[in-house]
Amino acid sequence: MFGLKDKVVLVTGGNRGIGAAIVGKLEKHGAQVAYTYRSDPGANGKLPIRADVTNLAEMDAAVQQVEEELGPIYGVVANAGITNDTLLSRMNPEQWESVISTNLNGAFNSIRPVAPLMYERKEGCFIFISSVVGEQGNIGQVNYSATKAGLIGMAKTLGLEGARYGVRANVVSPGFTETDMVRTIPDKVKEKILKTIPLRRFATEEEIAWGVVYLMSPVTGGYITGATLSINGGRHT
């Protein structure tokens, strides 16, 4: 249905949360999925690889391993990310750099080794996992917001650069999603957040994964590039 059978896809941070949901959903629709992790591997995926996205050499090696063991990479999902929240007036350089290094530099490190290969083969798709915070901002997350907005800019530019080679680049931008991080938010705070969401609920990880499948597919997403798919329940349009 989605034309993903036997397509090789690399997902960064695919061992848990939204990343694991993406891995599982892509697999369900026939893709051969490799994913990176830093600590514990997840339950899904054909090829788990321990690699740190902040390290270009490790990501280059990961890409080589995927190509050797699974075949030519068709898609990359730049999902790995962290938070380190506080107000800008209290944020130290380490808090800023840690988030920039993982979320923004990590995305560059993940796609840089693959792009020339895709361009040579004249097919492929990059998907960046951004956030509603990158589209509208959020108090206490200036570092996180900056990186997630940056991913949108990367996708728009790569959409232009890759078009001549038949390589697409898009963004999935989740709103508040039922992840482990959100589950730890106090109920009173959750209630306040829910009031800002017209659909009055958080997204499920599976709903975000469906967005990735849609854009990754050469059938449903084949004429979509440089676009942002916002999955946020109407919180920001």
Can you say where each PLM-predicted feature lies in the sequence?
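Conserved glycine-rich Rossmann-like NAD(P)H-binding loop of the short-chain dehydrogenase/reductase
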Residues: H29-N44
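Substrate-binding pocket helix/loop in short-chain dehydrogenase/reductase
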Residues: L87-L88, N92-I100, V182, I193
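Residue(s) in the substrate-gating loop at a strand-loop-helix junction
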Residues: S131
